[in-house]
Amino acid sequence: VTTRSIATKLAMALALVAAGGVSAALAAQVDHVLLGIDDLDHGIKAFEQATGVKPVYGGKHPGGTHNALVSLGDGTYLEIIALQKGVTDAGEYAGLKQLHTLTPIGWAVSSKDSAELRKRLSAAGLAVTEPVPGSRITPAGATLSWQTFGLKDNFAEAPFFIVWSAQTPHPATTSPSGCKLQQWHVAGSHLKNLEQLRAALDLRIDVADAKATSMRLSLKCPQGAITF
């Protein structure tokens, strides 16, 4: 293979992309992983004791939850989420009061190109819902905003999808650092759907077949490796 032939093939490929013949690479990734717990202060202390990194308080969500955050590097962060003091019901998050240790409860996938993200999912046979706006107020009084959507035929192991407002700094760049994501493992009875999702978005996750849904987060932190 000559240098000239390689250059010719590259030029042809770039021309196809420019003409819309093939889709450019989609920058989709695991945006954040959620660890649920019954009390946020307890969760912050437990995480710091286990890892050597203290999560920073993020703020309150309109729906009755609040959170603390840790950067996991490379555009991914960890969200510890709990009910706000005095809140007894927060819809889908009401079950947080039953969690007495930090427990993986969900995950999100992000992309800066919402239209392409939805297109890829649709092409893989995964229909999506309409976007819903979301927000959080920081301790400094700033409002962070985003849009989320999910799969129409949702299942327990599935992520939700998030597109951050252009004016909102990503939490991975503003939260305490020191921990790195080593592995995000998702298992459940919808293995085929998980594999479709992983392939469509080229996600770096591990998936497995199981009767019951389970999620496992492995980190490398200042005090060593830890798994939740």
Q: What does each model-found stretch correspond to?
A:
Residues 20-28, 61-63:
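N-terminal short leaders/motifs
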Residues 40-96:
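Glycine/small-residue-rich interface belts in oligomeric ring/scaffold proteins
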Residues 69-73, 78-82, 115-185, 201-228:
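Vicinal oxygen chelate
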Residues 40-54, 120-124, 190-201:
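Amphipathic alpha-helical segments
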Residues 83-117, 121:
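A basic- and aromatic-enriched beta-loop-alpha substructure that forms the phosphate/nucleotide-
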Residues 1-7:
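N-terminal secretory signal peptides that target proteins for export/translocation
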Residues 9-21:
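Bacterial N-terminal signal peptides
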Residues 25-40, 102-112, 160-192:
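N-terminal beta-strand motif that seeds the catalytic metal site of vicinal oxygen chelate
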